[in-house]
Regions:
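Acidic beta-to-alpha connecting loop that harbors the catalytic carboxylate
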Residues: 97, 127-130
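Conserved G1/Walker A P-loop phosphate-binding module
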Residues: 1-46, 56-58, 66
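Conserved beta-strand/loop subsegment of P-loop NTPase cores
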Residues: 89-93, 116-127, 146-155
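Switch II (G3) loop of P-loop NTPases
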Residues: 59-77
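Inter-motif core of Ras-like GTPase G domains
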Residues: 76-98, 112-116
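Conserved catalytic network of the ASCE P-loop NTPase/AAA+ motor domain
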Residues: 2, 49, 58-60, 82-86, ...
Length: 177
């Protein structure tokens, strides 16, 4: 029996939880390209992803899901097209404590527009325990105003259960049957 390999992309702004989410769910120790932050990113976290993160989930003996996390910094956007090749879907993580998370939605949905027009997207909002507004309904309405439909969840990127829920929602949206 041949191996089935699937690829899911995690994206979002610096500090939204991409590296943490992949580490929470991966069956292997994630491969990261974190470096010490040297720009305005330093105010959000001491290290930042400069190329990608990689993790792996073994669903069965012959089925794997490869997890790729993008850098949240725009200057590394040349990697984004490379990482989406062969991907089945996008998980957009948003930090609810950022100044304008709707600007983050605009930016990332525009940057990945070609990909999400062909594939599915799921949105996970982190740090809602620290900042309740905007709420999940606000995110859904904003996505609809951009002519986008995607499930939106309140998630803790450190939680295996929450990240599993995002992946299951993405896989279900691909094949609800």
């Amino acid at each position: 029996m041949s191996m089935i390999n699937r690829k899911i992309i995690f994206t979002g702004p610096v500090g939204a939880g991409k590296t943490t989410a992949i580490a929470a769910i991966s069956d292997i120790r994630p491969i990261t390209t974190d470096e010490y932050a040297s720009d305005m990113t330093k105010s959000r976290k001491p290290q930042t992803t400069v190329a990608m993160d990689y993790g792996l989930i073994r669903l069965s003996e012959n089925e794997r899901v490869h997890l790729y996390g993008t850098s949240g910094q725009e200057r590394f956007d040349f990697m984004w097209d490379i990482l989406t090749k062969g991907g089945i879907g996008l998980i957009l993580l948003l930090d609810n404590t950022r100044k304008d998370p709707f600007q983050d939605i605009r930016f990332y949905t525009n940057a990945f527009r070609d990909f999400i027009e062909k594939q599915q997207m799921v949105v996970g909002v982190t740090r809602m325990d620290l900042q309740r507004k905007p709420g999940l309904a606000d995110y859904r309405h904003y996505l609809e105003s951009l002519s986008l439909q995607a499930p939106v969840f309140d998630v803790d990127a450190r939680s295996h259960r929450d990240v599993t829920m995002l992946i299951q929602a993405l896989l279900f949206s691909l094949d609800p049957g």
